[in-house]
Design a protein with these regions (language model features):
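A generic structural motif
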Residues: 43-45, 70
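A generic "binding-loop/recognition-motif" signal
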Residues: 18, 28-29, 47, 65-66, ...
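Short, conserved beta-strand element in jelly-roll/cupin
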Residues: 26-42
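Short acidic-glycine-tyrosine-enriched beta hairpin
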Residues: 47-63
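Ligand-binding loop in jelly-roll beta-barrel domains
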Residues: 63-83
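Conserved short histidine dyad/triad with adjacent acidic residue
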Residues: 10-27
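Short loop/turn motifs at secondary-structure junctions and domain boundaries
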Residues: 5-6, 23-25, 42-43
Length: 83
């Protein structure tokens, strides 16, 4: 979390169970996210690109990017912050 706090504000962690989904949406801020446990797949720009994140992976999502997500078979825990 210390590394994330050095590059973003409003840092927090969240977890989801296996197979949970987020519908397509956007944010008005840039999101910096690290996968801590499990796995999650982010689907960007209406299926144009997929990012499979596992522990240790980092993603920077620009403000306004349409994205959805699918949690992996073992669930996931991520930390994120905004800038």
């Amino acid at each position: 979390m210390h590394k994330l706090r050095a590059e973003a504000s409003g840092c927090y962690s969240w977890s989801n169970g296996p197979g949970e989904r987020y519908v397509a949406h956007t944010h008005n801020f840039e999101k910096v996210l690290y996968c801590v446990d499990g796995s999650i797949t982010f689907v960007l720009e209406n299926e144009a690109r997929r990012l499979d994140l596992k522990p240790g992976d980092r993603m920077v999502l620009p403000a306004g990017t349409v994205h959805s997500a699918i949690v992996g078979d073992s669930g996931c825990t991520c930390i994120e912050g905004h800038r």
